[in-house]
Amino acid sequence: LTCFNCPEVYCNRFHTCRNGEKICFKRFNERKLLGKRYTRGCAATCPVAKPREIVECCSTDRCNH
């Protein structure tokens, strides 16, 4: 599995996940409309969203754009 791993809106940097990491995720704060920063990467399970945070998970290559 390969997942994107950069904070910009338009991300083109990705890496190969380690064994056991079968999910790509993208998380961001729903309140920051301008200057939105993302956290992207690989995970074994989908991370839990904090208050006012959105977490999207998927399981195909480079799906966390």
From Swiss-Prot:
Gene3D superfamilies from the UniProt entry: CD59
InterPro entries documented for this protein: Snake_3FTx, Snake_toxin-like_sf, Snake_toxin_con_site, Toxin_cobra-type
Tissue and organ distribution: Expressed by the venom gland.
The keyword tRNA-binding appears for this protein: no
One GO cellular component, as annotated: extracellular region
UniProt keyword terms in alphabetical order: Disulfide bond, Secreted, Toxin
Taxonomic superkingdom: Eukaryota
Sample GO molecular function, one term: toxin activity
Location of the protein in the cell: Secreted
Disulfide bond entries: C3-C24, C6-C11, C17-C42, C46-C57, C58-C63
Broad class of where this protein is predominantly found: secreted
Keyword Ligase: no
Family named by the database record: Belongs to the three-finger toxin family. Ancestral subfamily. Orphan group II sub-subfamily.
Entry function: Binds with low affinity to muscular (alpha-1-beta-1-delta-epsilon/CHRNA1-CHRNB1-CHRND-CHRNE) and very low affinity to neuronal (alpha-7/CHRNA7) nicotinic acetylcholine receptor (nAChR).
Designated name of the protein: Weak toxin CM-13b
